[in-house]
Amino acid sequence: MSLPALRRVKPENLHLTLAFLGHTPDERLDDVSGAAADAAARVSPFTLSFDRAGRFPDRGRPRVVWLGIAEGEASVLELGVGAYAGLRSRSLRFDERPLAPHLTLARVAEDASSAEAKTVGAAIDELAIPELRFEVGEIAVIQSVLSPKGPRYTSLATAPLAHN
């Protein structure tokens, strides 16, 4: 099925966001990296798998198509708790909305017609999810730069998960 209203996330850009900081001065990178290291130290390596598709918002015109976590959600949430605590302790500003772990697959184009958006919504309900499993051994601090061609992500630092 062709869904021209969807802007798919490039495979190399797929990620789970633990905390979104927005613009952060370069001189705070060590603090951000420290917060990531603190979070990673709380959690052992784990398996992450996905089992369902969904959309934001749940009703009305879809804007985001995502995959939901089947296995590993508790570990992702614990990483989020650790990241939030580390960022707060370093007086870093970030979006403190509750973490809703998901993997964004696509966004619905803002100029999509109502019919196209409705087709996307119906397609999500029919989407068969293949088994997707990953071993998670580290987290990364990622810089996102938006451009007309889409976001460009650069890894600035990584932090290995705890090895118990």
Predicted segments with their positions:
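Histidine-dependent nucleotide/RNA phosphoesterase domain, centered on the 2H-phosphoesterase fold
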Residues: 1-164
